[in-house]
Amino acid sequence: LSNAAGEEVVSIEGRQKLSTYLSDSLRVRFEQLNQEEQEVVLLLAYVARLARERDLNFGRFSRPEWLPRFGVRDHLNDPGGKCASYTLILGKLLRTSGYTVRKVGLASSKNNERSQHHVLEVWLPEAKHWAVLDTIFAHAFVDVSGRLRSAAEVRAAWGEGIKELPANYDMESFSYSCMYYTNWQRVPGFGIIEALFPGADAWLQAHEVALPFVIQMSGYGWIGTLAFGAAALCIVVPW
């Protein structure tokens, strides 16, 4: 996957074709981005193309949706959820290309229900800042200076300050005003921590503390986390 993506990203013809899969507003401003930003955006476009090609697979699961998907092939051919599966694929592609990534979740501004939409942030080492990428909408946010925005920057300008949203984007259901870095409520044993230290979740979100990407977005990661949590509870509860 990474080799195929790399070949398209470096060729002129491949870059031109991939850019057509980007959201309208991102495609218009693509040339304003620096080389590093263009590379990650083209990798985003590559995964967006895979997502569109496999749209017919979504909803036709060969296994129950709640069962974990363990590898890229599983997520490509039998996605457990479009945004989660393709965010994992983009994350692994970026990691293979030498980038650091982290998941960002978006909640509903109506009821603050989490896990409504998954996006990711990639660390740009040359620019020394995070940039948020959305695989399903093939979108990234560009500021007035032509630089990719981070999720926190989008949150700060959410509403009146954000104009370049993709078509059919539901601002209430997928709200950056309700973004989070890790859904700590799903982590085994976190309820005990929250009871002992009220506001722990809010503190962790404010300080951008997140579980490693591989734990949050892979079946192996969650099984390992559950096993660790169960073992920790067995040790803590007797005390």
Q: What are these model-predicted stretches?
A:
Residues 208-231:
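Juxtamembrane/start-of-transmembrane alpha-helix segments at the extracytoplasmic/lumenal side
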Residues 41, 81-88, 92:
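A structural signal for well-ordered alpha-helical segments within the folded catalytic domains
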Residues 2-81:
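Secondary-structure boundary elements
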Residues 76-83, 109-113:
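Short capping loops/turns at secondary-structure boundaries
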Residues 229-239:
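Alpha-helical transmembrane segments
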Residues 138-210:
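Extracytoplasmic/lumenal ectodomains and periplasmic regions of secretory and membrane proteins
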Residues 88-161:
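Hydrophobic/aromatic-rich core segments of domains that either
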